[in-house]
C-alpha cells in the first residue's frame, strides 16, 4: 500500500466530525426516529438482505460527514488495491486476497502478476473429488471401514471460522440431510481435556483427522496432531496414519515426515490470513467432508455476492462500508469501546466468537500503517450471545449500564420451525418478537414521566428509568442457508477492513500474538529441565517464579 505519514486525524474531515459530536450530544434517538425520511434513507437492501441503521446516533448530516471521511481516507483506492492484489499487508509484504477464495471460476484476480483464481479452483476441485471419495465410501480406513467421523485440528482462524459455519449449517434442512450418519468435530486447545472431549465415542477405525497448519509447525496444532497420531497408531498401527490423516498445509516436506501422504495435502497461500481463511481449504475441506461440496459451494457463492457488492456499490448504499464507517463513528468519535453481536438464531451461536477474532486481531492496533502512534482509539471489544439467551445474561448492562452499540441479526424463516397448537404465535415468532422489540427499547428507553403515569412508586422510579439513546442496527436475513451464511461472513470481514482502511492501520497482521509465544518458549524449557533434571527456577520475576514453583510442586505430570 502506498505510504503516507499523514494520520487520518489530521484531516479536515476528521476534525469536522470531532466538532459534530457536540451537536450529537444534544440529540436523542427518540427525536431522530420521528423523521420518517431519515429512517427510510437508512434502510439498505441487497440480495435478500435488509439493513436498518436508523437507530444509530447519526442524523443524515453525520452520514454525509462520514462519507467525506471515507474520501479523506482514500477508501475507494484502498479497496481497489486489495482486490488488485497489491501488498496492502505491508509489514509482511503480502497481498490480502481472501476474496479470491470464493471468486467464480472465470474471474481474474492477480497476485504478483499471476491469476490466483485458477490455483484456488484447482484446490477446490481436489477437495470436491476427495470429499466425494470419503463420503461415498470409495476411500476407506486401514481396516476397510468407511470414514464417517472427522476431527479437524487447527487453532485461531483455522478453528473459529470453520466452527462458526459448521454450527450454522447443522440444522439447515439441506445440510442436515447431507450430513446424515456423519460427525465433524474441531480440536483447537492444547489442553488435554479438549483432546479427550473430541475422541469420546469415536472409533479410530472410522475417523479421519484433518491437520490444518500452513507451515506444519504451529506449536499447539502439531502437538494435538501428534496426540491423535498416537491415538490412531495405538489402535491401528503406524501404517494407518496415511489412511486416517490428511493435511491442509504448504509444507509438503514436513507433511510427509509426519507420516501423511503429500498427495493428501491441500494447499493455501500466504495471501490468506488465518482469520480470513474459512473459504480456503482450511474450512472448505472439513465442511465438504461433513456436508458435501455442493452445499459448501453455495456458502462460497454467498460470500462472493457480497464481495462484488462491496467492490462495485457506491458507498452510500454499500452495506460493509456503511457498517464500517458507523463503527469508526461509534469508537473514535462517540467513545464507545465495545460492540455486542446479537444474532436471534441459535444456529449463529459461534458467529460472535469468530467475529471477535476477525475484528480484534485485525484492528487491535496502536500505530498507523507507517508506524506512527495513533492519537485516537481503534478497534472494538466484540462479544455476543444468541437472543434470547443474552437477554437473561448481559442485556441489563446494555440497557442501564455502559452504552454498547448492538448488532441485531434476525432470520425471517427458521431452519427448524415449530408451531404448537394453542400457542399465540410460533416459537420463531416468539423469538423474533424480541428481535424487533429490543432495538426500540434501547433507542427510546423509558422516562420518569412515563413511569409516573403508570403509577410506579416514587422509590422505584430511578431503578426503572431507562435513558435510551443507545445505538443499534438491525440486519434481517431471509433465511439461514449456506448461501446466507456466506453473505453474513463476508459482510463482517469487509466491515472490519473498512474500519482499518479509515483508521490507517494494517488490519492484516497480528504481531500482538507473538510476544507471549516467545515468553512461553522460555517457560517450556524451564519446565522440561525442572522436571527431568531438577533444575532450579531461574530468570523469572518474583511473581512468575512463585507461580511456577507452586505449579511444579503440586502438579502430577509424569517425569519425561
From Swiss-Prot:
Q: Which UniProt keywords apply?
A: Acetylation, Cytoplasm, Gluconeogenesis, Glycolysis, Isomerase
- List, alphabetically, the PROSITE patterns matched: P_GLUCOSE_ISOMERASE_1, P_GLUCOSE_ISOMERASE_2, P_GLUCOSE_ISOMERASE_3
Query: InterPro entries, per this entry?
Result: G6P_Isomerase, G6P_Isomerase_C, Phosphoglucose_isomerase_CS, SIS_dom_sf, SIS_PGI_1, SIS_PGI_2
Enzyme class, broadest EC rank: isomerase
Q: Which GO terms describe its biological process?
A: gluconeogenesis; glucose 6-phosphate metabolic process; glycolytic process
Could you tell me which Pfam families the record lists for this protein?
A: PGI (PF00342)
Catalyses which reaction? alpha-D-glucose 6-phosphate = beta-D-fructose 6-phosphate
Q: Which residues cross the membrane?
A: none
The metabolic or biological pathway listed in the UniProt record of this protein is: Carbohydrate degradation; glycolysis; D-glyceraldehyde 3-phosphate and glycerone phosphate from D-glucose: step 2/4
GO molecular function of the protein, one example?
carbohydrate derivative binding
* Any single Gene Ontology cellular-component annotation: cytosol
User: Its quaternary structure?
Assistant: Homodimer.
Record-linked NCBIfam families: PRK00179.1 (NF001211)
What PANTHER family does the database record attribute to this sequence?
GLUCOSE-6-PHOSPHATE ISOMERASE (PTHR11469:SF1)
Family indicated by similarity: Belongs to the GPI family.
- Supply the name of the protein: Glucose-6-phosphate isomerase, cytosolic
